[in-house]
Swiss-Prot record:
Signal peptide region: 1-18
Name of the gene this protein is made from: USP1
Chief location: secreted
Protein location: Secreted
Residue ranges of the region described as 2 X 7 AA approximate repeats: 59-75
Name by which UniProt lists this protein: Protein USP1
Keywords: Repeat, Secreted, Signal
Region: 2 X 4 AA approximate tandem repeats, residue numbers: 46-53
Length: 113
């Protein structure tokens, strides 16, 4: 009984230490993604909305309907497979009011971009 309680206490303690670390890692991934995405916008939707594309995350940037950006062909495959496909799909079917979230790359995959 005491051994079981000891393991339960250790498990709870490890969870308490792991949760903040995971939250910090998630916030770090999001901030890195947003910074890169704003810098390398990958596509402009048919309604004049620019899209940023970056590893694992996609956000709708500022609506710029007042700029004539609809004619700029920026659908360039600058990211590997899934993110490139999502860039083209989102550029063709924009949904400005939504946040598009995709599975983030691992650190090893990020190095190959």
């Amino acid at each position: 009984m005491k051994i079981t309680m000891l393991f339960a206490a250790l498990s709870a303690a490890s969870g308490a230490f792991a949760a903040p670390a995971q939250a910090v890692a998630a916030a770090k991934d999001l901030s890195i993604g947003a910074g890169v995405g704003i810098g390398i916008g990958a596509g402009v939707g048919p309604y004049g909305y620019p899209y940023g594309a970056y590893p694992g995350w996609r956000l709708q940037l500022l609506p710029l309907r007042w700029l004539s950006l609809q004619w700029i062909p920026l659908r360039i495959p600058i990211l590997p497979m899934v993110n490139t496909w999502c860039s083209v799909a989102c550029a063709q079917n924009p949904s400005p009011a939504h946040l598009h979230t995709f599975k983030p790359f691992t650190s090893e995959q990020f190095l190959f971009l």
